Structures are given as structure tokens and as C-alpha cells.
UniProtKB/Swiss-Prot annotation:
This is Phosphopantetheine adenylyltransferase. HAMAP family: PPAT_bact. ATP binds at residues 8-9, 16, 87-89, 97, 122-128. It holds the Pfam family CTP_transf_like. Its cofactor is Mg(2+). The keyword Transferase applies. Keywords: ATP-binding, Coenzyme A biosynthesis, Cytoplasm, Magnesium, Nucleotide-binding, Nucleotidyltransferase, Transferase. It is an enzyme of class 2 (transferase). It comes from Crocosphaera subtropica (strain ATCC 51142 / BH68) (Cyanothece sp. (strain ATCC 51142)). GO terms for molecular function: ATP binding; pantetheine-phosphate adenylyltransferase activity. The gene is coaD. Substrate binds at residues 8, 40, 72, 86. Homohexamer.
Length: 157
């Protein structure tokens, strides 16, 4: 079974990586898909995010990294994926993600959404939090993979 793990991943965090690592145990392939979000102003271009994700997932068999501009369910159909993989940190994530899962179901009845609760050590973690802390010179070494940490230091120096 193929799962799509969509997101902006700007940047990828250890929380995202945790979901990917657990996803490869459950699915034969996990396609981490950098989605274009017109409502966000990205720190890193899509190509850089693909590079970051590829580097920190290279040790994981069954992971592919891609990007897509459009509806996630259309991409899932294009890639013949049966599952959208989503991580949940807190209750407010569940409310938003459940609404999106129901919407996606109306667009693609054969694509299921599977939720994985994040490990508690990552329940506070978001890309936005990482960027805010890094912007002001705080340490994010416990929040992002090493290659992303280097990119953030370079960006904010």
C-alpha cells in the first residue's frame, strides 16, 4: 500500500521525520510530498525542501520525495496511493485534519486518511515555531535534522 505524506515542510522537523519513520513500517512506500501552499510565504524554495527531506530520509527504505501543485487527492490518484498520512499533535490538529479528511473523501472516495499521533516529545513542535526561534538566534538543534539546522543557520546569519 502506498501512502502520501503531504505538507509544506518549511522546514522539515524531527516531528515530521518521526511520522515518516513510523509510516515506512506501516506502508510499503511513503511519498513525502512538498505541497505548494499559496497562503504561505515559504522560507526555503520547494527544491531546497525536497533536498532537505531527501537527505534526512535517505536511510529509510520505501521513502520517495516529490512535490505537487494542486489538490492532494488528485496527486494521490496520480500516484495510485490509497492513503493520506497525517500527524496529529494536539486536539486542534485533529479538528482541522478531520474536516480536511471529510472534504478529501468527497473528492476521492477511495483515498483514506490515516492519522498518527506524534510522540509526546514532538507535540509542541511546528515549522513555524522552529523558524521563529531560529530567526532570533535560539537553538533548534533538538527540533530539526542536522542538515536543516545548517541551512537555518546559513539563512539567518
Amino acid at each position: 500500500m502506498i501512502a502520501i505524506y503531504p505538507g509544506s515542510f518549511d522546514p522539515i522537523t524531527l516531528g515530521h521525520l518521526d511520522i515518516i519513520e513510523r509510516g515506512v513500517v506501516l506502508f510499503e512506500k511513503v511519498i513525502v510530498t512538498v505541497m505548494y501552499n499559496p497562503n504561505k510565504r515559504p522560507l526555503f524554495p520547494v527544491e531546497k525542501r525536497i533536498e532537505q527531506i531527501t537527505k534526512c530520509t535517505q536511510h529509510l527504505p520505501g521513502v520517495e520525495v516529490d512535490s505537487y501543485k494542486g489538490l492532494t487527492v488528485d496527486y494521490a490518484k496520480l500516484r495510485k496511493a490509497q492513503v493520506l498520512l497525517r500527524g496529529l499533535r494536539v486536539l486542534s490538529d485533529f479538528e482541522k485534519e478531520l474536516q480536511m479528511a471529510h472534504t478529501n473523501k468527497t473528492l476521492a472516495e477511495d483515498v483514506q486518511t490515516i492519522f498518527l499521533a506524534t510522540n509526546k516529545e514532538y507535540s509542541f513542535l511546528s515549522s513555524s515555531t522552529v523558524k521563529e526561534i531560529a530567526q532570533f538566534g535560539g537553538s533548534v538543534s533538538h527540533m530539526v535534522p542536522e542538515n536543516v539546522l545548517r541551512d537555518l543557520r546559513e539563512y539567518y546569519r
